[in-house]
Amino acid sequence: FLPKMSTKLRVPYRRGTKDYH
């Protein structure tokens, strides 16, 4: 499992904001 994928999947509005958008 990757911490980056889990993070954006769990909290896409916290750390995946710049990555998700």
UniProtKB/Swiss-Prot annotation:
Domain of life from the UniProt record: Eukaryota
GO cellular component: extracellular region
GO biological process, one term: defense response to fungus
Keyword Magnesium applies: no
UniProt note on tissues of expression: Expressed by the venom gland.
Cellular compartments annotated: Secreted
Keyword Secreted included in the entry's annotation: yes
Keywords: Antibiotic, Antimicrobial, Cytolysis, Fungicide, Hemolysis, Secreted
Function in brief: Antimicrobial peptide against both Gram-positive, -negative and yeast. Also induces histamine release by mast cells and shows moderate hemolytic activities against both human and rabbit red cells.
Miscellaneous section: Minimum inhibitory concentrations (MIC) are the following: E.coli standard strain (MIC=12.5 ug/ml), E.coli drug-resistant strain (MIC=15 ug/ml), S.aureus standard strain (MIC=1.2 ug/ml), S.aureus drug-resistant strain (MIC=5.0 ug/ml), B.dysenteriae standard and drug-resistant strains (MIC=7.5 ug/ml) and C.albicans (MIC=15 ug/ml).
Protein name, entry field: Antimicrobial peptide scolopin-1
